[in-house]
Amino acid sequence: MMKVVFMGTPDFSVPVLRRLIEDGYDVVGVVTQPDRPVGRKKVLTPTPVKVEAEKHGIPVVQPLKIREKDEYEKVLALEPDLIVTAAFGQIVPNEILEAPKYGCINVHASLLPELRGGAPIHYAIMEGKEKTGITIMYMVEKLDAGDILTQVEVEIEERETTGSLFDKLSEAGAHLLSKTVPLLIQGKLEPIKQSEAEVTFAYNIKREQEIIDWTKTGEEVYNHIRGLNPWPVAYTTLAGQVIKVWWGEKVSITEKAEPGTIVALEEDGFVVATGNETGVKITELQPSGKKRMSCSQFLRGTKPEIGTKLGENA
């Protein structure tokens, strides 16, 4: 039986690991990030992949830095025929990449060469794409730059969020891997080099990228809100207080107003001017230190005036 090592960390990776087990491969080890403190109480919490591996009695390796010799040698000691990675979260060294008979392959959540990096799902929505997908490719030391083995497209719906697309792509990745591994073993795949001219990047989201830029078009603001839902969540400021914006709707506005200005108060939300004639009606938000709520709930306690400017001192 072929021995496989799986490397992954978040929820996205779990269906991929599960599919390898269901397909009957001998998963001899799982490599995942170390347990981390989570929440206000800083409770030391295992990764979703570690939890899944332990359910199946699979040995778990948790390197702080996989590139260090004493760490990668633990992986080599498992003598895998194939290594599969999916959102592992560290650059894997050549010593590991060159060891398995069938190589090291990665399940990546974009149609490479577009959106290399750690946040391809966020960026696909933030950039207003109508489709994205899964790429399975050989791993190299350079970020997401290996030769492509297989791809599948996934449609992005008008009201898609990063959360819903994350789930769709995770399942699509597991399904594509199930079809790819047998073809790889049989030598039936022709690897395709990525076009460097078409490369774009989706680096991990930084705090300053979470701020809503109201000078952008209404469509761009709407995509920004969707792309950061449910994490890390877009935000703006109202009367100097941070407000997380969980959801908004695109609406046509006729009023001429500076971007970021509240131009209408409605029962289910307030309409904010943007950089074009498409405004955004905020319908779900979370004031600083409070729970997520509908905008209608918020408006029962707080009534901002028309003409109030959002995003000042953000």
Curated annotation (Swiss-Prot):
SUPFAM superfamilies: FMT C-terminal domain-like, Formyltransferase. (6S)-5,6,7,8-tetrahydrofolate binds at residues 110-113. Keywords: Protein biosynthesis, Transferase. It catalyses: L-methionyl-tRNA(fMet) + (6R)-10-formyltetrahydrofolate = N-formyl-L-methionyl-tRNA(fMet) + (6S)-5,6,7,8-tetrahydrofolate + H(+). Its EC number is 2.1.2.9. PROSITE patterns: GART. GO terms for molecular function: methionyl-tRNA formyltransferase activity. One of its GO terms (cellular component) is cytosol. It is an enzyme of class 2 (transferase). Attaches a formyl group to the free amino group of methionyl-tRNA(fMet). The formyl group appears to play a dual role in the initiator identity of N-formylmethionyl-tRNA by promoting its recognition by IF2 and preventing the misappropriation of this tRNA by the elongation apparatus. Belongs to the Fmt family. HAMAP family: Formyl_trans. NCBIfam families: fmt. This is Methionyl-tRNA formyltransferase. It comes from Bacillus mycoides (strain KBAB4). The gene is fmt.
